[in-house]
């Protein structure tokens, strides 16, 4: 298995620290607002990778943190006139609900920053003792970037150039403009914890260093996150952790590509910013997940109606292949292993989901060909298709339920119209019955009458 390591800037063969075990840390969200489509992209990317590791037989400890104390959280809570605790709990529930809808597995462990304060303080104390941190004139504790010789090794940036670029941002309480905060002194009305430097709260970067150390150890296999976190967040994590622990922080670094909207950067100022729940109002979660998983994880992905409509068509092709066929493992044909080997070859090469999906569509084509001539063999291929779809986390909805739910379709309204049509037929009002059938057909809903009643599906 090889994948791109952001630290080395090239593809490398993956060698876990412990055989058959993987320890992986993914930077989670700062819980001050509902998750947006960019969060979905990052978390689906690493969910697919997590699922693939498990499929390949690894025992995965997958840690995804929650940043539950931050300037943004405090600001939003004040704007809402509520406590930070109330905002945090509501936002975490919203996150879980959205991720569950997208079939994102819950992490093995989901630490909160506020539950790891003692470990953060201990790390900062060690950094101060070793000369990597100091207390500024305003009481805040800062990391002394110039003392860490390898600063910039992840983002491939030169410290001297960074320092020159930040001269305009000179802050008197710091020795160097590049120094970043480890501990912030308390402000009136803000959450605070006691520390050797006075009451305050941690800086963002030390939170992840402490949480990963607590749950995965000083050195672990994989650290991952969105490409926007590579600098300064991940660079600062390395500086803190390696100075404190005197060993490699993470052996492999994975970064997911950003979401663009109609080829533009997604941002609230451009009014092209969408929450997960807003997108689900227009597209089924199956479609959203397929769309976000269909591009190689480290590439940018373009969010557009055209691309989502194409994803919907692809999802329906896969579902249609599994329609009217019962997946049966014992019926696996002898040549089924060839499909699985191609799938593994694709995913073993930097988690190449487009190539993996091409294998699934080849399987779907085979199933469709065999349905009417060899249902036994078709059911074996259907089992394999289901199995491999599960590795990517797609086709998680019941087939008939998917076609009933559709996109933006009001199921209760359809059922109501079917009941009205049934009554119209009983009343011999065939004109009204035909009108209802035609109206639904124009919406892409096909009615099927039988002796037991009327069923419907998307056309």
Swiss-Prot record:
One of its GO terms (biological process) is cysteinyl-tRNA aminoacylation. It is found in: Cytoplasm. A motif ('HIGH' region) lies at residues 29-39. It catalyses: tRNA(Cys) + L-cysteine + ATP = L-cysteinyl-tRNA(Cys) + AMP + diphosphate. InterPro entries: Cys-tRNA-ligase, Cys-tRNA-synt_Ia_DALR, Cys-tRNA/MSH_ligase, CysS_C, Rossmann-like_a/b/a_fold, tRNA-synt_1_cat_dom, tRNAsynth_Ia_anticodon-bd. It holds the Pfam family tRNA-synt_1e. Its EC number is 6.1.1.16. It is an enzyme of class 6 (ligase). GO terms for cellular component: cytosol. A motif ('KMSKS' region) lies at residues 265-269. Gene3D superfamilies: Cysteine-tRNA ligase, C-terminal anti-codon recognition domain (1.20.120.1910), HUPs (3.40.50.620). Binds 1 zinc ion per subunit. ATP binds at residue 268. Its main location: cytoplasm. Its cofactor is Zn(2+). Keywords: Aminoacyl-tRNA synthetase, ATP-binding, Cytoplasm, Ligase, Metal-binding, Nucleotide-binding, Protein biosynthesis, Zinc. Zn(2+) binds at residues 27, 208, 233, 237. One of its GO terms (molecular function) is cysteine-tRNA ligase activity. Monomer. Belongs to the class-I aminoacyl-tRNA synthetase family. HAMAP family: Cys_tRNA_synth. This is Cysteine--tRNA ligase. It comes from Francisella philomiragia subsp. philomiragia (strain ATCC 25017 / CCUG 19701 / FSC 153 / O#319-036). The gene is cysS.
């Amino acid at each position: 298995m090889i994948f791109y390591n952001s630290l080395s800037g090239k593809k490398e063969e993956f060698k876990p620290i412990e055989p058959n075990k993987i320890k992986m840390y993914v930077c989670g969200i700062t819980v001050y607002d509902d998750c947006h489509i960019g969060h979905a992209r990052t978390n689906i990317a690493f969910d697919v990778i997590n699922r693939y590791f498990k499929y390949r037989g690894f025992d995965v400890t997958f840690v995804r943190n929650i940043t539950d104390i931050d300037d943004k959280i405090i600001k939003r809570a004040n704007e809402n006139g509520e406590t930070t605790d109330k905002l945090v709990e509501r936002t975490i529930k919203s996150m879980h609900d959205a991720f569950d809808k997208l079939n994102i597995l819950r992490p093995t462990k989901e630490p909160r920053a506020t539950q790891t304060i003692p470990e953060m303080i201990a790390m900062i104390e060690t950094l101060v003792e070793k000369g990597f941190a100091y207390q500024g004139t305003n009481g805040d504790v800062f990391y002394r970037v110039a003392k860490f010789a390898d600063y910039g090794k992840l983002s491939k940036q030169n410290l001297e150039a960074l320092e020159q670029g930040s001269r305009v941002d000179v802050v008197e309480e710091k020795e160097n403009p590049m120094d970043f905060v480890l501990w912030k002194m308390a402000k009136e009305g803000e959450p605070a914890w006691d520390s050797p430097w006075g009451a305050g709260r941690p800086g963002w970067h030390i939170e992840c260093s402490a949480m990963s150390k607590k749950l995965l150890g000083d050195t672990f296999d994989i650290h991952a996150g969105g490409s926007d976190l590579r600098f300064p967040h991940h660079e600062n994590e390395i500086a803190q952790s390696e100075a404190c622990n005197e060993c490699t922080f993470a052996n492999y670094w994975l970064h997911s590509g950003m979401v663009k909207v109609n080829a533009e950067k997604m941002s609230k100022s451009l009014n092209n910013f969408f929450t997960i729940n807003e997108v689900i109002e227009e597209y089924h979660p199956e479609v959203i997940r397929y769309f976000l998983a269909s591009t190689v994880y480290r590439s940018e992905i373009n969010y557009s109606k055209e691309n989502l409509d194409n994803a919907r068509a692809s999802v329906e092709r896969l579902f249609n292949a599994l329609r009217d066929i019962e997946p049966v493992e014992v019926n696996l044909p002898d040549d089924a292993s060839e499909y699985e080997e191609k799938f593994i070859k694709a995913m073993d090469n930097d988690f190449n989901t487009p190539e993996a999906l091409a294998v699934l569509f080849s399987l779907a084509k085979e199933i469709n060909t065999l349905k009417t001539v060899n249902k036994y063999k078709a059911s074996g291929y259907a089992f394999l298709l289901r199995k491999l779809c599960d590795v990517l986390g797609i086709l998680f909805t019941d087939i008939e339920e998917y076609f009933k739910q559709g996109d933006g379709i009001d199921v209760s309204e359809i059922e109501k119209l079917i009941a009205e049509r049934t009554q119209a037929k009983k009343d011999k009002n065939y004109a009204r019955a035909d009108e209802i059938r035609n109206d639904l057909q124009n919406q892409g809903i096909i009615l099927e009458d039988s002796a037991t009643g009327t069923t419907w599906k998307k056309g």
